[in-house]
């Protein structure tokens, strides 16, 4: 079943104007890298996997999904996962303030550079060969 996230072959969405590859930044705004890092870090901690993360983004309302930027959809998916996993309450999300500490087992985890380097999805370069 196709949804709003799978527009391959669909008409009526206008032309696509990608940025030239030689000047396209990895992240367009400072917060995008943080969202990406949080999603990946919490995945490394075993709270969810890449399929669960994608599913959270794909469940966004179609209007929001199409209106949002790529990393705005990642942020919305992250918020959904944090709430559904019980790590945050809706009140905490809305106010942007934690009402208490994170679970002890998460506070005690330390993510080392070697943990990140040895993760299959980040072994590759994010830069394109030119």
Model-found features: residue ranges?
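A charge-rich, low-complexity, intrinsically flexible signal that marks solvent-exposed coils, linkers
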Residues: 1-130
């Amino acid at each position: 079943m196709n949804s709003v996230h799978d527009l391959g072959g669909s008409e009526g969405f206008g032309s696509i104007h990608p940025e030239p590859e030689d000047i396209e930044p990895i992240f367009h705004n400072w917060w995008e890298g943080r969202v990406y890092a949080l999603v990946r870090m919490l995945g490394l901690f075993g709270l969810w996997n890449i399929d669960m993360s994608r599913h959270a983004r794909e469940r966004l309302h179609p209007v929001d999904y199409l209106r949002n930027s790529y990393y705005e959809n990642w942020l919305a998916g992250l918020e959904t996962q944090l709430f559904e996993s019980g790590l945050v309450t809706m009140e905490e999300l809305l106010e942007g303030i934690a009402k208490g500490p994170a679970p002890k087992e998460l506070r005690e985890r330390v993510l080392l550079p070697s943990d990140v380097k040895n993760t299959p999805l980040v072994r590759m370069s994010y830069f394109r060969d030119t």
